[in-house]
């Protein structure tokens, strides 16, 4: 398997986006929960612990906090899946992450949602999610190496047909980790 990065090529500006609003909403949630729990960050809560204090939050603030807490749990699960060599589980977690970013954190947009959905429909793709701050940018997809060429061709065409402009694709590979090369 390899990672395929797809740039939706939607122009975006984080300063003018709702990115800072999301950060503020998470800070509001943290302060409210700190009234009853001694935590420094939402990441310290398990999803079960969050459910016990969710009543303190309302509306979008609750959704934003739920995303942060469940995303942290997914990261922990992803590390365990990687240690087991369970790439299919990692793909499932990527999909869940994208759904949470779309439905709870609301930072995806039609272009990123389209790229991720098209990727998930392709044979050989185990999972796909947006990366970065959102409101434009890129997705990553876990794709079987033998399927990459067809994956890019199919997703590119379907994305162009749906959105009206092309995405850019980059096939990446995971090497042996960080190395030092003496020049």
Give the positions of each predicted feature.
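Short beta-strand->loop micro-motif that forms the acidic, two-metal-ion catalytic signature
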Residues: 136-142
């Amino acid at each position: 398997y390899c990672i395929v990065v797809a740039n939706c090529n939607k122009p975006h500006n984080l300063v003018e986006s709702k990115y800072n609003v999301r950060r503020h909403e998470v800070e509001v949630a943290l302060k409210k929960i700190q009234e009853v729990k001694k935590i420094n960050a939402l990441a310290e809560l398990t999803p079960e612990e969050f459910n016990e204090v969710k009543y303190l939050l309302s509306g979008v603030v609750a959704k934003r906090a739920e995303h942060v807490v469940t995303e942290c749990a997914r990261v922990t699960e992803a590390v365990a899946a990687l240690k087991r060599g369970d790439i299919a589980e990692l793909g499932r977690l990527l999909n869940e992450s994208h759904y949470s970013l779309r439905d709870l954190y609301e930072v995806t947009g039609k272009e990123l949602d389209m790229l991720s959905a098209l990727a998930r429909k392709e044979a050989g793709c185990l999972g796909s999610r947006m990366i970065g701050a959102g409101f434009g940018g890129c997705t990553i997809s876990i794709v079987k190496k033998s399927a990459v060429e067809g994956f890019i061709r199919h997703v590119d065409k379907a994305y162009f047909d749906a959105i009206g402009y092309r995405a850019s694709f980059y096939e990446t590979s995971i090497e042996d980790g960080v190395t030092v090369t003496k020049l």
